[in-house]
Amino acid sequence: MFKRLAVSCLAVTMATAPALAHFQELLPSADVLAQGGEVSLDLVFTHPMEQGPVMQMEKPARFGVVTKAGKTDLLGRLEERKIDGKSTWRAKHALQEPGGAVYYVEPKPYWEPAEGKFIIHYTKVVVDSFATGEGWDEMVGLPVEIRPLTRPTGVWTGNLFRGVVLKDGKPVPFAEVEVEWKNDGSVKAPNDAFVTQVIKADASGTFAYAMPRAGWWGFAALVEADDKRKSPEGKDVPVELGALMWVKATDMGARK
């Protein structure tokens, strides 16, 4: 009797436990380079608020940068790094001209058997070279993408970040946006409800979120692809498309 009860309780717990939010990280060494120079970018597929686990990430389908000079393919600059035995990637890129640099990645589809779907998170982040405050709203032209309405560089902690969720260049009404902080180990969530913040875009696809703590914040607008893909078992399964953008919040320091 006790054994059957224990098994039943475990089944209920597993059924009601919230699914961990996957986030494609694309994190630069700095969001603003006051004197320009080299930026290092780390690409990891993980659960940022919970500091893992790290998922296997194959070499991306696309990786590049958009500047005022146009679009540049950086796929050849990626170097594989292993974390907990899983593939992650790192690239270095020199910014010699002033203005915004919009880095982006299209990962290869990730099969998530626990959710019965593929995941493709189109991710971008902006680095401001020479602190010009320009070029931050350049669009990459990804299948799903966040159009920032707030400059995503030089942002103070507590500032409101606003954006528009786009699919095929058109706003997505009432899109669901998941938000997570890149945990540096200093915060433990009271329970699972605090791990991933969830907000809804309005009828025009616009969302807003005030970042309460310094560090990197990931915004993941999730929509379902129009077409399905074949699972490893040969079944037609849905594809989750994520429009991700990373924004860094910085505390106001005292004047020295």
Model regions and ranges:
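Bacterial N-terminal signal peptides that target proteins for export
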Residues: 1-9
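Sec/Tat signal peptide C-region and signal peptidase I cleavage site
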Residues: 16-21
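Short, acidic Ser/Thr/Gly-rich low-complexity loop/linker segments typical of extracellular
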Residues: 186-204
